[in-house]
From Swiss-Prot:
Name this polypeptide is given: Uncharacterized protein BU385
Top-level division of the source organism's lineage: Bacteria
PANTHER family linked: ACID STRESS PROTEIN IBAG, BOLA TRANSCRIPTION REGULATOR
Protein family (similarity comment): Belongs to the BolA/IbaG family.
Length: 80
């Protein structure tokens, strides 16, 4: 599965407003932006993002994942 497919999967499954995926199958970096993260701890946010990817991780299609997650409001503050 390539980065674009991972992006579309996360957007669809998690109803994200935006997702940016970089890297390769050895290590991908995910920046996820969505209202699903409102009032959710960082640990829970990671669990939310891992859920749709777990089979790919188990099957070693993805080796390592770096996750940054934001609500739309947090993302706007981060961009400044």
């Amino acid at each position: 599965m390539d980065n674009q497919e991972i992006k579309l999967l996360l957007i669809k499954k998690l109803n994200l407003e935006q997702a940016n995926i970089t890297g390769d199958s050895n290590h991908i970096k995910i920046i996820a932006i969505g209202n699903i993260f409102k009032n959710v701890s960082q640990v829970k946010r990671q669990q939310i993002i891992y859920a749709p990817l777990i089979d790919m991780i188990k099957e070693k299609h993805i080796h390592a994942v770096s996750i940054m997650s934001y609500t739309p409001e947090e993302w706007e503050k981060t961009k400044k």
